[in-house]
């Protein structure tokens, strides 16, 4: 089930690790993983917990957002680290459930933490999707050369 692809990538996400902050080229693994494995490895209880929020989002929040048509579309100008209520997170997840192809979404994992894609992961969990694409960033700067 695990298919690996190796590539070099520059990332702009803040606070992932020193390699990213220094914009150092890193080997990146892209895997298809069972969502239940991701949840266990990343120690997620039910749904991811965001740092800047009022409380943990629950399935009822997502269900209510879908039922009431409260959908929050992606916005590139929105700071991903800014404060959002649990209802705002649920509206973002609801938008993904309604409009995104969840079979094709990708999340980014570094040091057993989802560093990009918590809303996508939440949408997949709620929709009972079995497999998700994961970009797995290494925790070390050592690069292995792999012949193609």
Regions found by a protein language model. Name each.
Residues 5-67, 79, 83:
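An acidic, glycine-rich, mixed-charge low-complexity segment common to nucleic-acid enzymes
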Residues 1, 26, 146-148:
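Short intrinsically disordered terminal tails
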Residues 109-127:
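A sequence-level detector for short glycine-anchored, His/Arg-bearing signature motifs
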Residues 130:
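Short glycine-/polar-rich loops that comprise or flank the Walker A/P-loop
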Residues 133-148:
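Short, Lys/Arg-rich amphipathic alpha-helical interaction segments
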Residues 61-113:
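Short alpha-helix boundary/capping and kink motifs at helix termini
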Residues 106-108, 122, 133-135:
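Ordered hydrophobic segments in well-structured contexts
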């Amino acid at each position: 089930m695990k298919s690996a692809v190796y590539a070099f990538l520059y990332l702009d996400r803040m606070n992932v690790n020193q390699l990213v902050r220094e914009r150092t080229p890193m080997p990146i693994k892209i895997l298809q993983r069972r969502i239940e494995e991701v949840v266990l490895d990343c120690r997620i209880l039910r749904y991811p917990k965001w740092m800047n929020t009022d409380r943990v989002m629950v399935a009822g929040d997502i269900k209510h957002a879908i039922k009431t048509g409260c959908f929050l579309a992606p916005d590139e100008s929105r700071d991903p680290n800014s404060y959002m209520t649990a209802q705002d997170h649920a509206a973002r997840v609801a938008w993904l459930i309604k409009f995104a192809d969840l079979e094709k979404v990708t999340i980014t994992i570094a040091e057993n933490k989802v560093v990009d894609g918590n809303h996508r992961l939440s949408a997949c969990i709620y929709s009972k999707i079995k497999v998700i694409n994961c970009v797995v960033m290494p925790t070390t700067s050592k690069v292995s050369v792999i012949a193609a």
